Amino acid sequence: MTPGDLLYTKEHEWLRIDGEVGTVGITDHAQKELGEVVYVELPAVGATFDSGGRFGSVESVKAVSELFLPVSGEVVEVNQDLGAAPEKINEDPYGSGWMLRIRLLDRNDVADLMPAEEYDEYTKDDTKEDAKEDAKEDNA
């Protein structure tokens, strides 16, 4: 279930806003597509990024994917636990699998993000295709 209190990007990152700070991670949809996450590259505290800027990467047993910041901001905290336990992204992408916290530089950036219902609609076709592929594998 996609949490309704978050905002989402087409690149499958999520943003939780709390005052002037935003918490960023990847969606459940993204972690399922990636498979088992084995490594995460995240920026240092103090780094600043424009909205849509690359802030790191996540490596899984399937692929390496770049991560993009949903809004412009300055990194104020990085989830250090992911260095030793990147699987938290798979286990709890909206909780203990968060990636970083940023001080928002422009609140207007959130206008380009999707609410949960719109994100669910955006990923619906992908989810159907995944279900078809899983059914084919089960019948093979």
Question: Model segments located where?
Answer:
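Residue-level recognition of beta-strand microenvironments
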Residues: 15-17, 61, 78-81, 107
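A broadly tuned preference for mixed-charge, low-complexity surface segments
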Residues: 63-71, 77, 118-126
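Aromatic- and Lys/Arg-enriched surface recognition patch
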Residues: 76-100
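Acidic, low-complexity mobile loops and tails
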Residues: 1-54, 91, 96-123, 127, ...
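Small beta-strand-rich domains/subdomains or short beta-sheet motifs embedded
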Residues: 7, 41, 59, 65-70, ...
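Short, charged/polar surface micro-motifs in flexible loops or helix N-caps
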Residues: 31-32, 45-48, 72-75, 81-83
